[in-house]
Regions:
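Partner-binding and oligomerization surfaces adjacent to conserved cores of proteins
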Residues: 1-190
Length: 190
């Protein structure tokens, strides 16, 4: 998914203390006032990186989350796939520079993060802490026109350890998913 498509307006953004630090540095180096420094910084908008970045999000909890089923599933017809981080890394079949990491949850009004284009992609507001997120990100070098998503080939045999169905799913859905697993020769537990 393109990182700019998430509902959270803070997704990929820089926290307030980072912005304040940048403004102070620009004022110091350029010898200008605060408004001029903010104007200069607006040319280096982090949203440009966010709109060119693709992410894949995983929950790293040891158990299912009712909150996540509720948040991300509009009906009882969906699945959750389990994997291990090493399997996820090995399953992604691309030569592009893929980054992996746990999300750090912060207060965007008081916490500062490391500088650079990657750290904003691995920090979220404390209110999302229940997601317990692990993220995979990819910033393609040659993507001039951002899209909603990007195809990245994966080895599903390495990737999928188990498939979970939502607690509200019906028997027919269990049967259907079992048939899909059998048809595509997916070696995993259901």
């Amino acid at each position: 998914t393109n990182a700019s498509k998430f509902e959270d307006p803070y997704e990929g953004m820089v926290p307030k203390p980072n912005i304040e630090h940048r403004v102070e540095k620009v004022q110091e180096i350029a010898g200008c006032d605060q408004d001029e420094a903010k104007s200069l910084l607006s040319f280096y908008d982090i949203e440009g990186v966010t709109s060119r970045t693709f992410v894949n999000c995983w929950n790293i909890s040891r158990h299912e989350s009712a909150a996540l089923w509720e948040q991300y599933l509009e009906s009882s017809q969906g699945v959750a796939v389990t994997s291990q981080v090493r399997d996820l890394r090995e399953a992604i079949l691309t030569d592009e520079d893929v980054k992996f990491g746990e999300i750090e949850y912060i207060d965007y009004n008081s916490d500062r993060i490391p500088e650079g284009p990657i750290p904003p992609l691995y920090h979220k507001r404390n209110s999302f802490e229940h997601e317990n997120e692990f993220r995979v990100s990819l910033i393609p070098e040659k993507e001039n026109n951002p899209k909603d998503g990007k195809y990245v080939p994966v080895d599903t045999g390495k990737l999928i350890n188990e498939i979970y169905l939502p607690p509200s799913s019906r028997g027919w859905f269990f049967t259907l998913i079992g048939e899909v697993i059998e048809t595509y020769d997916v070696d995993c537990e259901l």
